[in-house]
Amino acid sequence: MLPCYLKGRMMLKPRYRILCFFVALSVLLPFSTVRADQPFQRLLPFLIDLAGWQGEKPDGMSMQMSDTNMTTATRDYERGEAKAHASIIIGPAAAGALAPIQSGMNMQTSEGRMVTSTVRGMNVLKAYNSKDKSGTLVVALDKNAMFSLAYEGVAEEEALALADKFDWKAMQAATQTK
C-alpha cells in the first residue's frame, strides 16, 4: 500500500506525460504541413496526362535563397521511341531563357529553325531540328516564368498540337500568384 502523499504523484505522472505529448504535437504539427506545401506543388496539376502517351509522375523543386527564388515543375512522357519533356520554370533561369523571345529572334538553317511568334495571344519560341525530328516550344508566361515542351522523335505539327493541350493561361495565372 502506498502512503497517501505518493498517491497524488503517481496520478500526476501519466497526466503529465500525456500533456507533454500533446504540447509537443501541437508545436511540431505546423512544421510538417509547412514542408508539405512547397511552391512547386501548385504547378503540378498543369502537367496533364496526354492521350496516347505514358506520363511519369510530375515532380518539382523549389529553392529559396536570400536574394532569389526558383521553382520548377516537370513531367516526362514517352510513346514508343518518341519522348516529350514538359516543364514550368519560375525564376532567373526562366528570365534568361526568355531573352530570344523578347528580342524577336528568328533563325533558319538547312537543319532547322528557331522562330518567335504569338500563339493564343502569348509570345512563344519554336525551335525545330528537322534531321532529328526534335525541338522545343517555349511559352513566355511572365517576365520570369515559362512553360516549355521539349520533344524528340515527333513531327513539329504534332508537338505543337501536344503543347496546345496544356492550359497556358491557367499556368500564367498560377505563376503570378505569390
Please provide the spans of the model-predicted regions:
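Bacterial N-terminal signal peptides that target proteins for export
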Residues: 4, 10-22
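Low-complexity intrinsically disordered segments
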Residues: 7-8, 30
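Bacterial N-terminal signal peptides
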Residues: 20-30
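Serine/proline-rich low-complexity intrinsically disordered segments, especially terminal tails, linkers
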Residues: 28, 53, 166-167
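Sec/Tat signal peptide C-region and signal peptidase I cleavage site
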Residues: 31-36
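Short, solvent-exposed recognition patches
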Residues: 38-130
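A short, solvent-exposed beta-edge/loop patch
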Residues: 78-79, 83, 107-178
